[in-house]
A protein has these predicted regions:
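A short beta-strand micro-motif
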Residues: 2-7
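Short beta-strand segments
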Residues: 10-14
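Glycine-rich active-site loops that engage anionic ligands at enzyme catalytic sites
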Residues: 17-24, 28-127
Length: 127
């Protein structure tokens, strides 16, 4: 299933994976929140949910992979180094579930232009 992240005039199209995290987040959509930044990462709160760490949860993500950070109940999108990174990796503060991939990973680098408090919306892309 395709989803879209909208922040200001930037639209990022993604493909949800076939896992429990994606399934639960899709049921909550549309999700509207205000972003926070942490190095080259944005994250934002999601509504109450019961999402748990999946067996393949990880700390290091590739450009284009979308995470759900369980400890913060937040969607996290890394696009470069964070304060936890070693060298040039995209490292979250703790393990997170990989639940979606962007179609154009390089588009995530445009997130650098956004600041704390800016609104974001995540929704299912119309078929």
């Amino acid at each position: 299933m395709d989803i879209i992240f909208e922040i200001s005039d930037l639209k990022i199209k993604c493909k949800a994976l076939n896992n429990k995290t994606a399934e639960k987040l899709i049921k909550l959509m549309p999700i509207e929140a205000k972003i926070a930044t942490w190095g080259n990462e944005i994250y934002f709160d999601t509504p109450n949910n019961d999402i748990v760490l999946e067996n393949d949860a990880k700390e290091v993500f590739n450009l284009g992979e979308i995470a759900f950070w369980n400890q913060g109940s937040a969607i996290a999108i890394g696009f470069g180094k964070t304060p936890a990174s070693k060298k040039d990796e995209i490292r979250l503060i703790s393990k997170a579930n990989h639940w979606a991939n962007t179609y154009k990973p390089e588009d995530l680098k445009k997130l650098k232009a956004f600041k704390d408090g800016e609104p974001i919306k995540v929704s299912i892309l119309n078929k």
